[in-house]
Amino acid sequence: MSRNLYALVVAATAIGLAASACSGSPNSATKATPSATATQLQSLIPTPANTQRTDGPDSIPDNGIHLHFLVNGSSTDVLDAYKTALEGKGWMVTVVSSGRWAGAGGATYTGTQGDTYGVFSGGGSASAADVSACAWPSKPSNPNCGGGNRR
């Protein structure tokens, strides 16, 4: 191969590599993933066993949703079972706080599932528990999910 032809092949290869690096790829790691819809978020939130009433989903800031469940059963048992149900739905769960007293108690969990972020909290008596569940397409700057003004 002549020196000029070799230089031309090297230049063409370099241009081809540069062009392919600049073109979009359907498998690009930097490709933006679409935000989850409220319906998709709701499908990620399990309904606790023995739920007697469900409120929501309600829209909350940062494209999130909030659900409230009133559940029959000891609040400590309800929240322990709910953590297991979240993990069964694919959530990576972190216990933020938990406490028990005379059959009553409460807990707050955070969770991630891919980019989706959730806050799950609840508490109550020895016979009933309130559970609030919130999910967002990605972690919001203020992941407020319960009590007070969520809007």
Regions found by a protein language model. Give the residues of each.
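An acidic-aromatic pocket/loop used at catalytic or ligand-binding sites
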Residues: 2-8, 15-18, 23-151
